[in-house]
UniProtKB/Swiss-Prot annotation:
GO-annotated molecular function: ATP binding; lysine-tRNA ligase activity; magnesium ion binding; tRNA binding
Subunit field text: Homodimer.
Organism name: Neisseria gonorrhoeae (strain ATCC 700825 / FA 1090)
Catalytic activity: tRNA(Lys) + L-lysine + ATP = L-lysyl-tRNA(Lys) + AMP + diphosphate
Subcellular location(s) per record: Cytoplasm
Annotated cofactor note: Binds 3 Mg(2+) ions per subunit.
High-level lineage: Bacteria, Pseudomonadati, Pseudomonadota, Betaproteobacteria, Neisseriales
Protein name: Lysine--tRNA ligase
Listed Pfam families: tRNA-synt_2, tRNA_anti-codon
Primary location: cytoplasm
């Protein structure tokens, strides 16, 4: 395609005028034939053709006259004398079409010249190379399969407005190859995680999305109402308690990749509905869960990036080396070596320091809660390379098993990478009497004004009374994992349709 030939453009009309003009074209088509035919059968994809024939020379390819049927959206269109060129885009990539009055009838050529960018077409022909070496389909027949009534974004500027990208993701996917690649990678990451779990002999399961009692995490739920039963229901904030019921039932290794919902604020790291994997393994503990989380993340990075040493926001992240492990206090002192043990166990000093770092005071007044709040304010954001923070206080870990050797602490971890939480796991509490007491403590906190404290789940206690084996469990945020592995800074860029305020 010669560079001095300029693409055809519609008249300089505003969007409403363009839509009206295109509707008129559609009405003309309707009068002549079916405007939305569904009998074109393609046999080729653009990327497959480029891979198979792109490196073959013109002299070798042209005599083969390889027949193809290809379909896609018209992204470029140029006229050169009596010939026309177009570029169409399918899910795999782009390929050029060439039409002239030797290959197609003048009637077909005239029809084609009235089609617009964005129209979806099906073309049949043979492959050849242009003088510039571009793989091209010499068209023998072409059909309009679906008329685009709205103009595409300018091909040079693309779709640059962020809010429009999120609200009209369908346009973003058409116009921006980077966005398409992000969501292809997202799918590959999820498939990588799923394959890894199956390889570890885990069973994939599905548990309820609507719960009679919200549980499995400390968060505010969305509330709905079941009309037939006349009861309130809650969109799940986590699948944990149902998955552990399955472990009680003898399904010793289970996992679920699905949505959870939390009725809380939105930010670059938070969307009200989000995807996570949770997995549970009988006769296991938090040490095994840390290794599982590490292996899952490292394997996913290798799958989509070819390496576990990646770059995020211009800075290297080492997912290849063993992940560091620190306690909450060790992490605080690593970045604040001037803090003393005496200060870190002084409730009043902790409260002042928490406020100084811009954090809210926790609803629970215990030392452990205060230490955790200080960690979030002064250390969490500095954990760049993957780091497990271990041994969380009992008061902030109502479902985790208490440590046998460390008074007031649990066998719990959270994984932080690039300054944000990516995973949470623990040795599961399997003593039903201890669990019942912790639920009661959570109810007391809720009565005292903590909206995120847990409810008392009597059925879960009943399940535990049948015997929950020693179990390890872990949850990994899929959206944040995709952000990490695609080098994107906001969660909205990795969710196809993020939550938005209505227009």
């Amino acid at each position: 395609m010669s560079e001095q030939n300029h693409p055809q453009t519609e008249p300089q009309l505003d969007e409403n005028q363009i839509i009206a003009l295109r509707r008129e074209k559609l009405n003309n088509i309707r009068q002549q034939r079916n405007a939305y035919p569904n009998d074109f059968k393609r046999d080729s994809f653009a990327a497959d053709l480029q891979a198979q024939y792109g490196e073959i020379g013109k002299e070798e390819l042209d005599p083969q006259a390889v027949p193809v049927k290809i379909a896609g959206r018209m992204m470029l269109k140029r006229q050169m004398g009596k010939a026309s060129f177009a570029t169409i885009q399918d899910v795999t990539g782009q390929i050029q079409l060439y039409l002239n009055n030797k290959g197609v009838s003048q009637e077909v050529l005239d029809d084609f010249n009235h089609w617009d960018l964005g129209d979806i077409v099906g073309a049949e022909g043979t492959l050849f190379k242009t003088n510039h070496g571009e793989l091209t389909v010499r068209v023998s027949d072409i059909r309009l399969l679906s008329k685009s009534l709205r103009p595409l974004p300018d091909k040079h500027k693309g779709l640059s407005d962020q809010e429009t990208k999120y609200r009209q993701r369908y346009v973003d996917l058409i116009a921006n190859e980077e966005s398409r690649n992000t969501f292809i990678k997202r799918s590959q990451i999820i498939q990588s995680v799923r394959n890894f779990m199956v390889g570890e002999h885990y069973l994939e399961v599905e548990t309820p999305m609507m719960h009679p009692i919200p549980g499995g995490a400390t968060a505010k739920p969305f509330v709905t109402h079941h009309n037939a039963l006349d009861i309130p229901l809650y969109l799940r904030i986590a699948p944990e308690l149902y998955l552990k019921r399955l472990v009680v039932g003898g399904l010793e290794r289970v996992f679920e990749i699905n949505r959870s919902f939390r009725n809380e604020g939105m930010s670059v790291r938070h969307n009200p509905e989000f995807t996570m994997i949770e997995f549970y393994e009988a006769f296991s503990d938090y040490e095994r869960m840390m290794q599982m989380a590490e292996d899952i993340i490292r394997n996913a990075s290798r799958t989509v990036n070819g390496t576990a040493n990646i770059t995020y926001n211009g800075k290297e992240v080492d997912l290849e080396s063993p992940f560091e492990r620190l306690t909450i206090l060790e992490a605080i002192k690593k970045y604040n070596p001037h803090y003393t043990d005496e200060q870190l166990n002084d409730a009043e000093w902790l409260k002042k320091e928490i406020v100084k770092h811009g954090e809210s005071l926790p609803p629970s007044p215990g030392i452990g809660s205060l230490q955790l709040a200080l960690f979030e304010g002064c250390a969490e954001g500095k954990l760049w390379n993957p780091t497990f923070i271990v041994d969380y206080p009992v008061e902030v870990s109502p479902l985790a098993r208490a440590s046998d050797t460390k008074q007031g602490l649990t066998e719990r971890f959270e994984l932080f990478v690039v300054g944000r939480e990516l995973a949470n796991g623990y040795s599961e509490l399997n003593d039903p009497e201890d669990q019942a007491e912790r639920f009661k403590s959570q109810v007391a906190q809720k009565d005292a004004g903590d909206d995120e404290a847990m409810h008392y789940d009597a059925d879960y206690i009943r399940a535990m009374e049948f015997g929950l084996p020693p179990t390890g469990g872990c949850g990994i945020g899929i959206d944040r994992l995709v952000m990490l592995l695609t080098d994107l800074q906001t969660i909205r860029d990795v969710i196809l349709f993020p939550q938005m305020r209505p227009e």
